[in-house]
Each structure stands twice: as structure tokens, then as C-alpha cells.
């Protein structure tokens, strides 16, 4: 019985995270269609292996430098490999006063929801 409950909890957690993931990707695409700046925060090597059309590569380690040139009210969609680094960039940019930023998650997640 205990393992059945654990399995049920695991299934719910996996399903819930998938729903959230697709929602954030869908929101990302909606913003992109409205003209948001698309920023890939992965490394240059990862970016060269594939990226979204019209994306610019501002690696997470360089976010503080690159975003000094961008209006803080500019709509921005961030993504990376899994959503972790773009989440870190989101938190940093929010703390810097950026008002229209969105963490769209990972590249594959975005591609699957296009």
C-alpha cells in the first residue's frame, strides 16, 4: 500500500510539472509572437549546437554585462537547456528592475510547444 501511494504521488508530481512546463513554454511563444526579445542563456558551445530562431546568446555568466544595454521595460523571453539557468537569470534581472521578463524553460520544451 505504501508503495502504491508513493507511485501515485510520483505520477502526480510528474504530471503537474509537465503541465507547468508546457504553460511556461506556451506563454513564451505568445510573447515572442508579440515581439519579445528571445535570449538563450546557455553557453556559446550549447548555443552553436542549436537554438531558437532569432535568439541571441547571453550566457548566464555574462547576463549582468549584456543586459546593461537593454531597456528594463523591454519584453524578454529567457530559455536555457532545462529552465534552471533561465530561472536564475530571471531572478537576477527581476532584482535589477526588469519588468517584462519570462522564463520559458528549456530549449526542447520550447520546441515541443511551438
Model-predicted regions and their roles:
Residues 2-7, 18-36, 45-74, 84-114:
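Rhodanese-like catalytic fold shared by cysteine-dependent sulfurtransferases
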Residues 14-15:
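Sec-dependent N-terminal signal peptides of Gram-positive bacterial secreted proteins and lipoproteins
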Residues 39-40:
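Structural scaffold elements adjacent to functional motifs in cytosolic proteins
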Residues 80:
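Short cysteine clusters
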Amino acid at each position: 500500500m505504501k508503495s502504491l501511494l508513493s507511485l501515485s504521488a510520483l505520477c502526480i508530481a510528474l504530471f503537474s510539472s509537465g503541465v507547468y512546463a508546457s504553460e511556461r513554454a506556451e506563454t513564451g511563444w505568445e510573447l515572442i509572437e508579440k515581439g519579445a526579445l528571445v535570449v538563450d542563456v546557455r553557453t556559446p558551445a550549447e548555443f552553436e549546437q542549436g537554438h531558437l530562431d532569432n535568439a541571441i546568446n547571453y550566457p548566464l555568466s555574462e547576463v549582468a554585462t549584456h543586459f546593461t544595454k537593454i531597456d528594463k521595460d523591454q519584453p524578454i523571453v529567457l530559455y536555457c537547456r532545462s529552465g534552471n539557468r533561465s530561472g536564475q537569470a530571471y531572478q537576477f534581472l527581476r532584482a535589477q528592475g526588469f519588468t517584462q521578463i519570462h522564463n520559458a524553460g528549456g530549449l526542447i520544451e520550447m520546441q515541443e510547444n511551438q
